[in-house]
Design a protein with these regions (language model features):
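Membrane-interface loop-to-helix entry segments
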Residues: 103-105
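Acidic/His- and Gly-rich active-site-bordering loop/insert found
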Residues: 2-101, 110, 117-125
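Acidic/histidine-rich catalytic neighborhood of metal-dependent amide-processing enzymes
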Residues: 107-151
Length: 151
């Protein structure tokens, strides 16, 4: 498997973030802690613009490439958990009773944070990357609400 050394250099940070998200799952439109961490990480990575509260608890970041240009591409991840009791027994199991990241959204959010960090540090592209961290994907209309609020 081919890997990117720059991403390998912060892979352990991403693992810690994912395990933290997994241990603290939040249901749709309740992703206050998660969205706060996402926004703080984006700012720490040097993302050009960070907008919070889009669609309730959604976060949108913009990274401008070094090549300029008007083209845009959107990358999206969902942040919400499911109303399920976790019984996995892993060290980073849910600490919120009746809530679990059983659908991988903790991983999706972390992967997009990893992409954000890499893109913000390298900026080896033209145009703008729009990072969309969506709340309430599990049937609650988080995407519709983000669009209605200007995404």
């Amino acid at each position: 498997m081919t890997t990117i050394p720059k991403i390998e250099s912060f892979a352990s940070d991403l693992t810690a973030i994912r395990q933290d998200f997994h241990a603290h799952p939040e249901l749709g439109f309740e992703e206050v802690r998660t969205s706060g961490i996402v926004a703080a990480q984006l700012r720490a990575y040097g993302v050009d613009e960070v907008h919070e509260g889009i669609g309730g608890t959604g976060v949108v970041g913009l990274i401008n490439g070094q090549g300029g240009g008007n083209r845009r591409v959107g990358l999206r991840a969902d942040m919400d958990a499911l109303p399920i009791e976790e019984t996995s027994g892993v060290a980073y199991a849910s600490t919120n009773p009746g809530r679990m990241h059983a659908c991988g959204h903790d991983g999706h959010t972390t992967m997009l944070l990893g992409a954000a960090r890499y893109l913000a540090e390298t900026r080896d592209f033209d145009g703008t990357v729009v990072l969309i961290f969506q709340p309430a994907e599990e049937g609650l209309g988080g995407a519709r609400r983000m669009i209605a609020e200007g995404l």
